[in-house]
Amino acid sequence: MVVPATRLTLIGKPGCHLCDDARNVVTRVLAGLADPASVSLEELSILDDATLNEKYWDEIPVLLVNGNVHTIWRVDAERLVRALEKAQRDQDS
């Protein structure tokens, strides 16, 4: 079993059109990877977690790469690809 080296966390909430847009970009980027199994994607809702709600309520969607904020509001596909490539290089070194 391959353990994903890079963790993506998409924080949003239901009914958020920017969250839907972000999910679509992330899904497209992951589908285009040579090794999509090397990246895991977890989606969290601020409605289910008071801590996330307090921290991110006015910034969703928020995309984390390995626990660090990568972007808020809009996900840029090219920037995400570069971040994933960097995360992979960092894991390999």
Map each language-model feature to its residues.
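Alpha-helix termini
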Residues: L30-P36, Q88-Q91
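A structural signal for the main folded, soluble domain(s) of proteins
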Residues: L18, T27, V69-V75
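A short, hydrophobic beta-strand/beta-hairpin element that forms part of a small beta-sheet core
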Residues: P61-V69
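Thiol-based oxidoreductase modules, predominantly thioredoxin-like and allied folds used
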Residues: P36-A50
